[in-house]
């Protein structure tokens, strides 16, 4: 099964630059033919950082990289755990546009703590509650 996943705890190699990370990922999970990488890096606010090591990125920048890698591929299943973690308002806007552009034809499972923006595009909702 081919799955795209994004979560705050998904590790990225901190010694790689953004450019190296994207090239490495692309070897295993090619981007769709209509995917314009430079355009999406700009929308993510990452264009000026493509030669910088990920170890210099903020938590919000790293989350945008994780989302980009998970969503912008041809995987039929997408798992997103707390996708808005560490994102500012611009990051939330980027997430929404990325989902609308690439993910709506996929099966998406979102783990969320009730942030409607994280799953507003979902057609079904399952509420899991812990009872003591």
Region locations from a protein language model:
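ABC-family nucleotide-binding domains
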Residues: 81, 87-88
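Conserved ABC ATPase "signature" region
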Residues: 23, 34-49
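Hydrophobic anchor residue at the start of the ABC signature
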Residues: 67
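Conserved ABC ATPase signature
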Residues: 53-60
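ABC nucleotide-binding domain signature
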Residues: 1-10
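Q-loop/switch helix immediately C-terminal to the Walker
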Residues: 9, 14-30
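Conserved catalytic loops of ABC-family nucleotide-binding domains
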Residues: 98-119
